[in-house]
């Protein structure tokens, strides 16, 4: 279509009015500036996913009336954002002669002693059920402290409460970032094994990675893959971006020997654990593919032995304290793990336990009663995992790292996971998250993850999001948010529709960014938002205003076939040469992405065309590196022989940027050529199962990693 806006006739239609009323986009402009209007059947389906009936004309009008009436008659919004240091106005509804009375209970349980002023509202009077509703405003004072508070408002004998999220205006940069920058490494934790590993990298390996990278290279952070909770027994989803829960962490990374209980095992039990470890030690030398399931089956046997040995009085008290701190939320994951353990993986059928039963089902209660020890075992595993991850971050800070762990937050969760099964009301029903068509994915993308329901978020004070962010900052110095545009809008795809047949649903980004600012400030941490691709100007502006860094990837910093000089990159970003969706630098320079896509049948056109495009990109990058003085032109005479020099030039370019954070990839530093993840594949390629190896295919063990000559050369460049 040539128009870029909806006409008045379309805007007046009830289905369009209803969609806009609840934040559903009825049109959008694509990446190529192409304009699209959303079909009615898509809007009806997305409204249904929000719990709103739009099945016919009468239902649409009734839904509009119901929603508007609810908004007009509620005294206060369920969730209110307050910016610390500024006055905030809260809209209050009541009768013309009613005088609102308000009080605030602070997060710590005390009463706010300051004065809450009342300010007159608009002259607009709304007639509702034969009465009249007027609007006035409560003014929350600038000195209201940060935190999650409870606002209680009484009007005309009726009382309502609202969650007040009192957050800093922005996240302040760390002192070392204000005038300069910090650099660190990025890696996939599971891929880096030591002699003490059980087949994949674990939390003890992470501790060593952090401490050794600071000690031997001067790095100040380690960006790692998401550590969200996974399945408790095989089959285990390999992608860390499709977790069972984002509230809890992955206990398959536990190192049994690092637990205090291991040290006091009986000789017989200790011998059993050691023998189990010996069984999987050969996995550490496999350079081809990681075997998570064999690793976990074996490690789990060892953990059962340790669990059954019991806890000392002090350790039991620490476990009890953990359970008290996490509250009832631990029951969601532990119960789901028990069900998965005993009833198996979801198969999607109507008889599937995930569909058939819910948290209150009698069958679930019976299973919990039948296996109390297994239920406690899963609670215990989560506690142990949390302890070991926390110990890794603590060791990083004690070693002198300014940040330590940069945790990665996935976009969403598995549709059959514990978050969705335990609290389905928090999620949209009958829709998944994805992306509209673009130049790389002409049919759009469906990520198979149910979106959070923005209406439920508002009604519950965004508690699920608050808890998740708080949990991540408990064990990290920074959080990277995958697809941060999702805090502003998400592409919803109705069940049964193609990925292209969806629309955007908007979220209250100010509140979600406020939560990030509050949790990051409390932790003295940093937030990085993955904002690659085309980002609306208002999103970039909002992220910047909140002190959230974006992402700059050297291979993506191009326009019209020319690469942007690193000195011209935006400063408020985490810069890297590549991402986990691309081959490492050596593989990319050797056109590994072309070869792999051809091999897997992922090319939409002739391989010659893709190769030609890749060569043009390749040559443009090398030209930029030469023009900017990062690479001597003589290196181009034999690129393969001078590959290390070219990779060094890529990193000299990275170091030449003004970006506040810079990350070097460990895979680049050891010469690895294989990509960790090939988008558009599942079983065709071993995504998220590639162990760390050098360019010759030899395993690089953690014990030798920081003595690697190439790694030290790249570290020297990053230190400047």
Show the residue positions of the predicted features.
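Alpha-amylase-like alpha-glycosidases and glucanotransferases acting on alpha-linked glucans and related
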Residues: 109, 233-386, 412-661, 667-668, ...
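Carbohydrate-interacting/catalytic domains
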Residues: 1-224, 262-267, 521-522, 526, ...
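Acidic/aromatic-lined carbohydrate-recognition and catalytic surfaces
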Residues: 49-110, 114-115, 123-148, 153, ...
């Amino acid at each position: 279509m040539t128009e870029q806006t909806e006409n008045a006739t379309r805007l007046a239609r009830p289905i369009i009015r209803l969609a806009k009323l609840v934040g559903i986009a009825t049109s959008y402009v694509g990446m190529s500036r192409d304009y699209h209007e959303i079909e009615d059947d898509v809007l009806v389906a997305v409204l249904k996913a929000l719990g709103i009936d739009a099945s016919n004309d009468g239902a649409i009008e009734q839904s509009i009336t119901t929603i508007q009436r609810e908004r007009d008659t509620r005294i206060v919004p369920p969730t209110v954002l307050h910016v610390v240091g500024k006055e905030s106005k809260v809209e209050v509804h009541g009768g013309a002669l009613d005088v609102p009375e308000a009080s605030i209970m602070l997060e710590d349980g005390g009463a706010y002693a300051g004065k809450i002023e009342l300010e007159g509202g608009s002259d607009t009077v709304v007639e509702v059920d034969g009465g009249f509703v007027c609007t006035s405003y409560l003014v929350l004072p600038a000195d209201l402290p940060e935190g999650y508070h409870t606002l209680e408002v009484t009007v005309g004998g009726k009382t309502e409460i609202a969650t007040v999220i009192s957050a800093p205006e922005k996240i302040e940069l760390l002192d070392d970032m204000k005038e300069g920058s910090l650099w660190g490494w990025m890696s996939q934790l599971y891929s880096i094994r030591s002699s003490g590993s059980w087949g994949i990298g674990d939390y003890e390996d992470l501790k060593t990675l952090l401490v050794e990278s600071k000690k031997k290279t001067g790095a100040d952070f380690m960006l790692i893959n998401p550590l969200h909770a996974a399945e408790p027994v095989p089959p285990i989803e390999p992608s860390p971006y499709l977790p069972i829960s984002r509230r809890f962490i992955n206990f398959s990374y536990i190192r049994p020997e690092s637990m205090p209980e291991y040290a006091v095992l009986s000789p017989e039990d200790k011998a059993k654990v050691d023998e189990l470890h010996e069984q999987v030690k050969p996995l550490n030398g496999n350079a081809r593919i990681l075997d998570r399931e064999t690793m976990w089956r074996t490690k789990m046997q060892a953990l059962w032995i340790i669990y059954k040995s019991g806890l000392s009085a002090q350790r039991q008290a620490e476990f009890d304290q953990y359970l008290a701190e996490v509250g009832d939320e631990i029951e969601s994951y532990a119960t789901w793990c028990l069900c998965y353990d005993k009833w198996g993986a979801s198969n999607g059928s109507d008889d599937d336990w995930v569909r058939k039963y819910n948290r209150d089902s009698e069958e679930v209660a019976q299973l919990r009663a039948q296996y109390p020890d297994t239920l406690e075992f899963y609670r215990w595993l989560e506690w142990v995992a949390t302890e070991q991850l926390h110990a890794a971050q603590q060791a990083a800070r004690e070693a002198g790292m300014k940040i330590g762990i940069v945790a990665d937050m996935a976009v969403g969760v598995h549709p059959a996971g514990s978050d969705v099964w335990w609290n389905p009301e928090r999620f949209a029903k009958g829709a998944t998250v994805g992306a509209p068509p673009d130049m790389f994915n002409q049919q759009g993308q469906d990520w198979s993850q149910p979106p959070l329901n923005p209406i439920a978020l508002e009604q519950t004070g965004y508690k699920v999001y608050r808890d998740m962010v708080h949990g991540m900052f408990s064990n990290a110095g920074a959080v990277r948010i995958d697809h941060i545009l999702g805090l502003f809008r998400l592409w919803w795809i109705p069940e049964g529709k193609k990925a292209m047949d969806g629309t955007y649903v908007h979220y209250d980004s100010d509140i979600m960014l406020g939560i990030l600012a509050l949790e990051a400030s409390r932790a003295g941490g940093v937030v990085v938002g993955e904002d690659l691709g085309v980002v609306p100007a208002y999103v970039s502006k909002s992220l910047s205003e909140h002190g959230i860094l974006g992402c700059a990837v050297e291979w993506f910093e191009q326009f019209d076939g020319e690469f942007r000089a690193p000195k011209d990159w935006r400063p408020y970003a985490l810069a890297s040469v590549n991402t986990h969706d691309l081959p490492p630098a050596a593989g990319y320079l050797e056109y590994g992405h072309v070869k792999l896509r051809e091999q897997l049948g992922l090319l939409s056109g002739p391989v010659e065309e893709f190769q030609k495009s890749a060569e043009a990109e390749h040559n443009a990058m090398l030209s930029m590196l030469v023009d900017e003085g990062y690479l001597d032109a003589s290196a181009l005479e034999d690129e393969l022989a001078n590959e290390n020099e070219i990779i060094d030039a890529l990193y000299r370019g990275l170091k030449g940027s003004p970006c506040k954070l810079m990350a070097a990839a460990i895979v680049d530093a050891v010469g690895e050529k294989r990509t960790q993840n090939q988008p558009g594949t599942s079983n065709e390629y071993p995504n998220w199962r590639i162990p760390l190896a050098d360019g010759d295919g030899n395993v690089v063990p953690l014990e030798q990693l920081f003595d690697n000559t190439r790694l030290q050369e790249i570290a020297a460049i990053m230190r400047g």
